[in-house]
């Protein structure tokens, strides 16, 4: 059972558990804390390796929104990385305080961990702040490694806001609407300035410095537009502007103030017509710790239909939209939202009635793909009012490449409806796929609208049918959706939004009683794109049919879906390419991992498209080092020199697969120097684990393996001897021998087959040793962790034929 007394947290080592990785070891004992109090000591030794050591205690307690976790710490040893983590009761979500290259204090020192020092680390919650704790973890992660000790004592949890007494003052007030009413649950409805106040303001004194991450303001009435400055001060004398609003509207406003702390806040209003506040809720740092977290927080305050699904921390799946030449591509998600370019804004449809809106959250949604698997997905909405079909595609070539989206609405009522397509500052790609600019928010700072097009920063959205209404809105107006919710369109046609959260829309009347209306929007990828021809979609489909002329597989009806799925997958491989670079995805994975690329290239070769793999190998070979090292990944920025030792075997396997499928001896011969160089480097790596000290019992399980590497994300923080690398290495040597045979290099072929056979024997011996030593009933993924890695095992058996 987890302990419930935080104050006694460090009293008993038996209530803690040590979890080491690899060769590392750790032990827990009692220690004498400051003032003679009991403490906990962790002694650790990485024994010359990398990895981590975790000390974990299950303990239950709750947290306030703002807190200080205070503990005493001392230690000695190298400057490794120190982590203090809070785990929720599910055990799945973690918040982490991290000190890299932390020099442990030799004497007892107080360490204060604030709520803003514990950002969300990982887990299905996707973000937010911790509220209930189920376990504490203290982690030492090897930097230089080595050995040392760290001791802890005197842990406490404090709420620094408890002693703060808030009070408010204002420039004026009307009867029964005093300044302090904003801070209370007052029936009077908050504070209101006097009607003759020429410069109204309202201010709060928190009674001390308060940490906060934002404000949620409820206004007393729905004034058309509010303008005000929010100012902060530490002493009530010197003020700085924290936020400025010029067109705020609606009954509630959300203001992000990441990392803010202040004693005083003051609202200065532009006029007394809008000078009133019903209530203010101060929000903690997690409210706006990142721009994406801020939108997550805002979405919880509005109806579900106002924001795309992922802002409610729900996964919305998506598929790429592109052409056979790759290069640029859009995304379509399950709800019909279309991202117009990499890290770009999105087009989102709405149906407007006289008084409200219909969105993805109100519709029965169905996803479709042509029966033959061609890459033309489309979405249908069914509602009580109307049916809507959303069909995106890409046409053109080179600099004329353009994204098209056709919307077809059928109004099934006798009433007036409008189809509105909004430009929103959100990607289809969710924030948990964040990488650089990818994922979550796509900032929009300025928009200009006309009946025919919207200029969104430097990008254009044009319509083949003039809109009946158009307009733009800033975030402080709740965006265009704030108007849609009232069945309206915004009236401003040109805006700038310093927050980068501008939105806009075009709307068209949908004829009543079942008649259909359709409109096509165009978003050029480059400057030379033209308006779509009437048969644009049919031409794009014909282009795909010609380009992806797959073999005429004869299969029974039960297997036709499998062939269609293969066609879709092959199409996606082409869509996601960037010139010769084969990339496993359209956004986060726009990088060429040798692993993914040769497997996908081999699939395309089997599908009658051998040039895809051949072009890739020609391009990738340029990045091989002179010593034969094959990089694991290359992207637009160049080579990533991260060590993943599966890359060398994959490179050799890919060249051999190309020869098997297209029989091009001349091409294989042109890469022979690269083949020999990769084999030499592969054997050089293996030789590092064949020295006498690796025959000693403590290291014998590593004998003959490839050295440690970060062959997948799970090993990034602490590289290990990965059997995934080894299986690829064995198969790479076998592939090299096959190439040598085909090219007439018999001595090389014989030698490399021997190398492969001996390598495989050492790998199997190591696996058997780990299984016996750790008492496993599965094939481990690595020597150090003995981890269950079904992907690696399936790859060895299925892809590489080690059965």
Report residues per predicted region.
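Substrate-binding groove/exosite segments of carbohydrate-active enzymes
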Residues: 487-507, 546-669, 709-711, 721-723, ...
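Extracellular ligand-binding interfaces
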Residues: 44-124, 145-151, 156, 216-244
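Hydrophobic/aromatic beta-strand segments within beta-rich folds
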Residues: 69-71, 113, 133-141, 168, ...
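Terminal accessory carbohydrate-recognition/targeting modules of carbohydrate-active enzymes
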Residues: 275-276, 281-557
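The feature captures the catalytic groove of carbohydrate-active enzymes
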Residues: 500-534, 584-586, 634-650, 683-758
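Disordered, acidic Ser/Thr/Pro-rich linker "stalks" and the adjacent N-terminal cap
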Residues: 30-34, 41, 158-212, 218-228, ...
């Amino acid at each position: 059972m987890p302990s419930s007394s935080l104050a006694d947290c460090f009293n008993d080592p038996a209530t803690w558990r040590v979890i080491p990785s690899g060769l590392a070891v750790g032990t827990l004992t009692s220690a004498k804390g400051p003032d003679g109090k009991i403490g906990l000591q962790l002694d650790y030794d990485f024994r010359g390796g990398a990895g981590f050591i975790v000390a974990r205690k299950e303990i239950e307690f709750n947290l306030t929104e703002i807190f200080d976790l205070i503990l005493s710490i001392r230690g000695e040893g190298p400057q490794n990385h120190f982590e203090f983590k809070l785990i929720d009761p599910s055990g799945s979500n973690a918040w982490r305080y991290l000190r890299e290259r932390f020099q442990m204090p030799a004497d007892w020192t107080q360490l204060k961990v604030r709520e803003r020092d514990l950002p969300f680390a990982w887990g299905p919650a996707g973000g937010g702040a911790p509220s209930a704790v189920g376990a504490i973890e203290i982690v030492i992660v090897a930097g230089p490694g080595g050995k040392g000790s760290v001791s802890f004592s005197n842990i406490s949890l404090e709420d620094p806001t408890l002693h703060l007494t808030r009070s408010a003052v204002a420039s004026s007030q009307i009867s029964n609407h005093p300044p302090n009413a904003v801070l209370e649950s007052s029936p009077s409805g908050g504070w209101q300035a006097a009607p003759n106040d020429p410069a109204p303001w309202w201010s709060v004194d928190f009674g001390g410095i308060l940490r906060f991450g934002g404000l949620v303001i409820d206004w007393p009435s729905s004034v058309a537009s509010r303008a005000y400055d929010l100012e902060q001060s530490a002493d009530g004398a010197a003020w700085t502007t924290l936020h400025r609003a010029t067109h705020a509207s609606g009954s509630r406003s959300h203001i992000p103030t990441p990392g803010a702390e202040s004693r005083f806040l003051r609202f200065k209003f532009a006029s007394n017509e809008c000078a009133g506040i019903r209530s203010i809720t101060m929000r903690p740092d997690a409210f706006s710790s990142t721009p994406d977290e801020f939108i997550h927080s805002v979405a919880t305050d509005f109806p579900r239909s106002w924001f795309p699904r992922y802002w409610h921390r729900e996964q919305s799946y998506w598929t790429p939209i592109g052409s056979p030449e790759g290069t640029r591509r859009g995304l379509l998600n399950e709800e019909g939202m279309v991202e117009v370019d990499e890290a770009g804004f999105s087009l989102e449809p709405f149906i407007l009635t006289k008084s409200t809106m219909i969105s993805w959250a109100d519709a029965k949604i169905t996803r479709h793909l042509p029966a033959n698997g061609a890459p033309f997905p489309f979405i249908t909405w069914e509602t009580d009012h109307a049916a809507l079909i959303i069909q995106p595609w890409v046409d053109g070539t080179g600099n004329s490449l353009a994204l098209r989206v056709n919307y077809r609405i059928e109004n099934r009522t006798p009433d007036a409806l409008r189809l509105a397509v909004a430009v929103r500052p959100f990607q289809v790609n969710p924030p948990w796929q964040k990488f650089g600019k990818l994922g979550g928010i796509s900032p929009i700072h300025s928009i200009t609208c006309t009946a025919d097009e919207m200029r969104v920063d430097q990008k254009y959205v044009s319509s083949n049918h003039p809109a009946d209404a158009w307009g733009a809105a800033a975030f402080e107006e709740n965006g265009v959706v704030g108007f849609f919710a009232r069945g309206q369109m915004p009236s401003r046609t040109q805006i700038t939004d310093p927050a980068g959260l501008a939105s806009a829309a075009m709307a068209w009347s949908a004829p009543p009683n079942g008649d259909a209306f359709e409109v096509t929007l165009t978003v050029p990828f480059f400057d030379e794109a033209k308006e779509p021809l009437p048969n644009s979609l049919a031409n794009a489909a014909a282009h795909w049919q010609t380009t992806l002329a797959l073999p005429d597989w004869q299969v029974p009806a039960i297997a036709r879906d499998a062939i269609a799925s293969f066609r879709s997958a092959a199409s996606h491989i082409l869509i996601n390419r960037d010139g010769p670079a084969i990339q496993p995805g359209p956004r986060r994975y726009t990088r060429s991992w040798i692993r993914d690329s040769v497997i996908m290239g081999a699939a395309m070769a089997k599908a009658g498209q051998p040039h895809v793999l051949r072009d890739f190998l020609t391009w990738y070979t340029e990045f091989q080092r002179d010593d034969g090292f094959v990089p694991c990944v290359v992207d637009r920025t160049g080579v990533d020199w991260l060590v993943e030792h599966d890359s060398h075997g994959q490179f050799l396997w890919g060249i051999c697969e190309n020869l098997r499928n297209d029989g091009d001896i001349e091409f294989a011969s042109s890469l022979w120097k690269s083949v020999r160089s990769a084999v030499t480097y592969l054997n050089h790596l293996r030789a590092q684990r064949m020295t006498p000290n690796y025959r000693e019992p403590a290291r014998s399980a590593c004998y003959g393996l490839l050295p440690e590497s970060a062959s997948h994300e799970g090993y990034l923080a602490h590289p290990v001897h990965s059997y995934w690398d080894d299986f690829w290495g064995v198969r790479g040597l076998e592939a090299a021998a096959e190439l040598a045979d085909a090219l007439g290099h018999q001595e090389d072929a014989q030698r490399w087959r021997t190398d492969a056979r001996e390598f495989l024997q050492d790998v199997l011996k190591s696996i058997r040793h780990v299984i016996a030593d750790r008492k496993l009933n599965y094939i481990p993924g690595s020597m150090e962790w003995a981890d269950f890695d079904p992907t690696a095992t399936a790859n060895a058996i299925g892809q590489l034929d080690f059965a």
